[in-house]
Each structure stands twice: as C-alpha cells, then as structure tokens.
Amino acid sequence: MASASQKGWMVPPGLAFLSFSAEAWRAHAEASMPRFYFDVAEYKRYFEIGQPPWTPGVSVHYALDKALSMMLDEGLDEVFSRHVRAAERVRAGVADLGLSLLPDLSCASNTITAVNLPEGINGADMLRIMREEHDVVLAGGQQSLSGKIFRIGHLGLVSDEDIDGVFSALKLTLAKLRG
C-alpha cells in the first residue's frame, strides 16, 4: 500500500507512507535491479534502530500528528461518512449546472469528482479564471483526458460552504466563458 500526506490526511505534501507484505520484502531481497535513488531496505534498517536515514520534514510530521488527532477525535466512521456526504454534494452541484460526470456512479470516488468539460469550453481558460478571479483551484485532466475534464477534490477537511463556494464560482466562470 502507498499513500502520501496530501492524500486525505489533511497535511501538506512531504511524506510518503508505504506498507509491504512479507512476500513483497522477499521479492525485494531477491531483486537484482540497481537502486540508485530510493531503497526501502535502507529505510527498514534505520527504522529498526528508531531513526530516519536522512533529515525528515519535521514540520510535516507535526502536521500529521495534529491531523491524526483531529481524525481520531471526529471518529473514523464520521470521517468516512463526511467524505460520502461531500461527494454527494459535489455530484448534486455538477447536476445542477447541467454538467456530466466522467465515471459511472458505480465507480465514482468519494474523494475527487471528474467532470466532463462542457462543449465549447476551454479547460485551461476555465481553470485560470477559477484560480485568478475566484481563488478556487481545480485540477484539469491528465494525459488522454487533458482538456476534456476537470476535477474537483473533496478529500480531507472540506465543508459544505467550501463546496458551495466552488459551484458559485464555477457558475460565474462558465457564464463568462459562454459569453
């Protein structure tokens, strides 16, 4: 398993979380390919003596400690339920604007929503206006979806007011782009 501090942990980028099965460790030990940049065995050796192999991002560790405390105080069931409610609110906002989702609802995420760009709307212009005029940062599509979709993240501590603000800005932005 792999994760990163900015992926729902309510922490800035800077930490990676990795977990390996016994089988994965055996495969690593038997692998012969060179390890030029990152070797998990190095981290494992240092972990066993209670130290990191290099200077860690200490402030990010403190942020993680605080975020984990907040999640435990809220309760994990409530954290997961909050993400479901946020996803439902975002999907309702998408529908209210007459937009369509990229994925089928059966496989839609509770942490990010991919939305098809409306016909005739330039995605780069939309993202720029959202950012520059409304202080709202959305993500575009990647690779084959570049210029075809945009993504609304609702991962971590996202309130109803945050979501409503995104859709207020999006409504204004789409109206401006449609002329």
Task: Give, region by region, the residue ranges found by the protein language model.
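General beta-strand structural signal in soluble alpha/beta enzymes
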Residues: M1-A4, V11, L138-G140
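Active-site C-terminal subdomain of aminotransferase-like
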Residues: Q6-A92, D96
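Flexible, glycine/charged-enriched surface loops at secondary-structure junctions
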Residues: E74-R82, D96-L105, G141-Q142, R178-G179
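Small/polar glycine-rich anion-binding or flexible loop at a beta-alpha turn
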Residues: A87, S106-I112, Q143-R151
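Conserved PLP-binding catalytic core of the aspartate aminotransferase-like
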Residues: S100-E133
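A common structural junction motif
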Residues: R131-L138, K171-L177
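PLP-dependent enzyme catalytic core of the Aspartate aminotransferase-like
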Residues: S144, K148-G179
